[in-house]
A protein has these predicted regions:
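Hydrophobic alpha-helical connector segments
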Residues: 1-37
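C-terminal peripheral helix-coil segments that are non-catalytic and often amphipathic
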Residues: 25, 61-157
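Short amphipathic alpha-helical interaction patches enriched in hydrophobic/aromatic residues
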Residues: 2-3, 49-52, 75
Length: 157
C-alpha cells in the first residue's frame, strides 16, 4: 500500500507512522491497550529472558521484516543492514518514550508534556524519517573511533 504514495518523504512518514501508531493507541483501554502492552514488551525485552526473547521474535519479527523491507523499497540506495540498525534505534526510542514520558516533561521544564501521544508520535516519525534518510555509512569511515589512550576492555576511571 505504501508504494502508492509517490513522494518518498510522504511514503516514509506513512510507513513509520503505521509502525509506531499501534504502540500509542488504546492506552485508556482497560484490557491493556497498545501503550500498556508496548511498555510491558519494552521492560520484558530489557530483562534478557531467553524465553521472552523467543516469544517476542516469533510474534514480531515478521512485522519488523515487513517494515524494514518497505523502508528498503523506498530507500534502495541504503544497505538493508543500515536500515535494520536504524529500525532497532526506532524501537529503543519508542520504548523509552512510552516507559519514561515524564522525562520529556522534566527536561523541557514543563514546556512539553511527555504524555502527549500525538506530539510524541509526530516527533518520533520526523526523527526516524530523518535518520532513515541519512547517507549510508562509509565502511572506511565507520570503523570504531577510539579516544586517545583508550584500551578496549579496560574500565574508565
Amino acid at each position: 500500500a505504501a508504494r502508492r504514495v509517490r513522494d518518498v518523504q510522504d511514503r516514509l512518514e506513512a510507513i513509520v507512522r503505521a509502525y509506531v501508531l499501534p504502540a500509542f493507541t488504546s492506552g485508556s483501554d482497560l484490557a491493556g491497550g497498545g501503550t500498556r502492552f508496548t511498555r510491558l514488551r519494552a521492560i520484558m525485552s530489557a530483562e534478557g529472558n531467553e524465553v521472552v526473547r523467543k516469544i517476542i521474535a516469533q510474534t514480531f519479527d515478521d512485522t519488523s521484516h515487513a517494515f524494514i523491507d518497505a523502508i528498503h523499497d523506498s530507500l534502495p540506495h541504503i544497505p538493508r543492514t543500515d536500515l535494520v540498525w536504524r529500525g532497532h534505534f526506532l524501537l529503543g526510542a519508542l520504548y523509552y518514550t512510552l516507559v519514561t514520558p515524564e522525562r520529556v516533561s522534566r527536561l523541557s521544564r514543563g514546556s512539553a508534556e511527555g504524555t502527549d501521544a500525538g506530539h510524541a508520535i509526530e516527533e518520533l516519525v520526523r526523527a526516524t524519517v530523518a535518520a532513515l534518510q541519512a547517507p549510508p555509512l562509509d565502511p572506511a569511515i565507520s570503523a570504531p573511533r577510539r579516544a586517545p589512550g583508550f584500551t578496549p576492555g579496560r574500565a574508565l576511571t
